[in-house]
Amino acid sequence: MPKQEKMMLVLLILPLPYCNAAGVTTVQWGGHGDGLDRYLQRGVRDVHRPCQSVRPGRVWGKCCLTRLCSTMCCARADCTCVYHTWRGHGCSCVM
């Protein structure tokens, strides 16, 4: 598949909110500034979960249901975020 077709496919899929097996939930702000808060208050989600914008100035946010470590979510809430030389950030979980 040519690069341009892949980019168009990604752009078509991006606006859809999703939650994957790693516990990553991506949400789109409503442009009013409190859209993410309203999303987190629904159901059993905790408003105090760590969230960050994917890119500064963008309307997308990334929230972890466990622990946020750099740009990824750890497998469990009791994991710690550590920096590995040459590999970057990663989660360290006690068994």
Swiss-Prot record:
Q: Which GO terms describe its molecular function?
A: acetylcholine receptor inhibitor activity; toxin activity
Keyword list (alphabetical) reads:
Acetylcholine receptor inhibiting toxin, Disulfide bond, Neurotoxin, Postsynaptic neurotoxin, Secreted, Signal, Toxin
Compartments, as annotated in UniProt:
Secreted
Where in the sequence is the signal peptide annotated? Answer: 1-21
Q: What is its main location?
A: secreted
Q: Which domain of life is it from?
A: Eukaryota
User: Any chance you could tell me the propeptide residue ranges?
Assistant: 22-45
Claim: rRNA-binding is one of the keywords in the record: no
Q: In which tissues is it expressed?
A: Expressed by the venom duct.
Tell what the record comments on domains: Displays a mini-granulin fold, a structure composed of two short, stacked beta-hairpins connected by two parallel disulfide bonds. This newly described fold is derived from the same cysteine connectivity as knottins (ICK fold). The name 'mini-granulin fold' comes from the structural homology with the N-terminal region of the human granulin.
Q: What does this protein do?
A: Alpha-D-conopeptides act as non-competitive inhibitors of nicotinic acetylcholine receptors (nAChR). Through its two C-terminal domains, this homodimeric protein would bind to two nAChR allosteric sites, located outside the nAChR C-loop of the principal binding face and at the adjacent binding interface in a clockwise direction.
State the family it belongs to.
Answer: Belongs to the conotoxin D superfamily.
**The protein's assembly and partners:** Homodimer. Pseudo-homodimer (identical sequence, different post-translational modifications).
Q: Please share what else the UniProt entry notes about this protein.
A: Negative results: shows a very weak activity on alpha-4-beta-2 and alpha-4-beta-4 nAChR subtypes.
Q: What is this protein called?
A: Alpha-conotoxin GeXXA
Q: Which organism is it from?
A: Conus generalis (General cone)
